[in-house]
């Protein structure tokens, strides 16, 4: 193993059933997962993934999965569904760590997703410091709950939690209809809630000695809990209609939220195309800098309306993006307005672009004039940014 570099190892991209061949490496690295959960994952989900693996000879030493999810994205007053990738199972054998294995796999996966014009990808990091150098940034904070008086009692269909009953197969279409409608009313970005989604989720929670519990039944469903019993018991998700407490939910919100999901812009054009104007038409010229996916670099001409977005690259923008990357290296601000002399309105690093699209960056920060920029120009850009409808309400609560 000594002296072997990632570039000398064989890169493989298993798909379908071949992804299951990486189970031994998964178990070696994620040894804290229960056998029951691992069995579930490799029976129900692994074959749906696309794998990336480095082998030393025939031995897998580093891996990751791209797990496809149907993501609902608000587009004006409607939604579009895109298959996007959740990066999971990032694992390297201990003797091969800190040698660039993950770097090679992650960059290869990003390039493949870029080739498919995917707007973004997301993951749940074990350590956010690992992914920040690859321009990932947090976009979703998960609400925390405590369990009140109402432990899980009974078994099978008679299992209850407080005043809630465990979901049965007959409840699936009603739960899917309720959840999808709820998400569309409250969020701009979420995983599609349908019968296959809740069927898989029930199996996943059962693998963690938990389940799905309902407030109400059939077409009268008013809320649900996703509960996992492993360790101390955990409410993974709590959704209800109306005032909290009206349905006897045994989960109490603490008011705290924990950052759990990071995302990265993959294709800048596709990402910017998700935005809409709140009214009328708004034109912006945005300089983007990406140290990994160089096709994103340059000046993007954007015309946002209430119904769509036209985004195309200015071929003269490459030099501007290069100059911006040099300022980034000197710890200059990563999100700023351009001066009146520049050929663009706004400069965005990849983390700044991602944060801004998902409502994590304020318009005032975006339009902060620097380097002698005209104050009126900064205010003009700020007004434009305030007129753009971003995807501010994110609910990416899938935990792997």
Which residues are covered by each model-predicted region?
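Conserved acetyl-CoA-binding loop-helix of GNAT-fold acetyltransferases
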Residues: 89-92, 98-113, 243-253
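Conserved active-site alpha-helix within GNAT-family acetyltransferase domains
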Residues: 115-119, 125-144, 270-271
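Amide-forming acyltransferase catalytic core, primarily the GNAT-like/NAT-type
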Residues: 142-244, 249-284, 289-291
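A glycine-centered beta-loop-beta connector
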Residues: 55-59, 216-220, 370
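C-terminal functional modules
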Residues: 258-400
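Conserved GNAT acetyl-CoA-binding A-motif
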Residues: 112-125, 254-261
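Short hydrophobic/aromatic beta-strand element in the GNAT-like acyltransferase core
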Residues: 49-53, 63, 89, 210-214, ...
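Short amphipathic alpha-helix that is part of the acyltransferase structural core
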Residues: 1-68, 75-86, 153-195, 230-233
């Amino acid at each position: 193993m000594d002296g072997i570099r990632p570039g000398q190892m064989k890169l493989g991209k298993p798909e379908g059933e071949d992804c299951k061949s990486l189970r031994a490496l998964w178990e070696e690295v994620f040894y804290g997962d229960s056998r029951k959960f691992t069995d579930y994952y490799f029976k129900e989900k692994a074959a749906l993934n696309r794998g990336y693996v480095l082998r030393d000879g025939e031995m897998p030493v580093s891996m990751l999965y791209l797990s496809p999810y149907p993501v609902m994205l608000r587009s004006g007053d409607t939604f579009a569904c895109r298959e996007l990738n959740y990066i999971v199972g990032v694992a390297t054998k201990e003797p091969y760590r800190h040698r660039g294995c993950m770097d090679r796999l992650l960059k290869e996966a990003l390039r493949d997703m870029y080739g498919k014009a995917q707007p973004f990808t997301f993951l749940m990091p074990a350590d956010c410091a690992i992914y920040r150098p690859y321009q990932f940034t947090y976009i979703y904070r998960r609400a925390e709950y405590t369990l009140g008086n109402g432990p899980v009692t009974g078994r099978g269909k008679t299992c209850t939690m407080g005043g809630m009953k465990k979901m049965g197969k007959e409840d699936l279409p009603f739960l899917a209809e309720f959840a999808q409608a709820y998400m569309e009313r409250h969020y701009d970005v979420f995983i599609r809630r349908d019968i296959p989604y809740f069927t898989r989720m029930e199996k996943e929670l059962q693998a963690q000695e938990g389940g799905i519990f309902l407030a109400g039944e059939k077409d009268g469903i008013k809320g649900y809990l996703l509960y996992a019993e492993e360790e101390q018991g955990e409410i993974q998700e709590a959704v209800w209609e109306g005032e909290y407490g009206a349905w006897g939910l045994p989960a109490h919100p603490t008011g705290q939220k924990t950052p759990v999901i990071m995302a990265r812009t993959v294709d800048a054009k596709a990402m910017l195309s998700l935005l809409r104007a709140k009214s009328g038409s708004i034109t912006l010229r945005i300089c983007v800098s990406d140290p990994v996916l160089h096709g994103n670099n340059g000046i993007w001409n954007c015309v946002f309306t209430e119904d769509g977005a036209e985004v195309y690259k200015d071929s003269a923008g490459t030099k501007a993006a290069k100059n911006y990357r040099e300022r980034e290296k000197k710890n200059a601000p990563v999100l700023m307005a351009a001066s009146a002399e520049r050929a663009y309105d706004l400069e965005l690093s990849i983390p700044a672009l991602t944060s801004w699209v998902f409502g994590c960056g304020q318009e005032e920060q975006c339009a902060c004039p620097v380097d002698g920029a005209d104050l009126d120009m900064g205010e003009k850009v700020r007004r434009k940014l305030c007129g753009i409808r971003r995807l501010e309400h994110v609910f990416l609560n899938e935990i792997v």
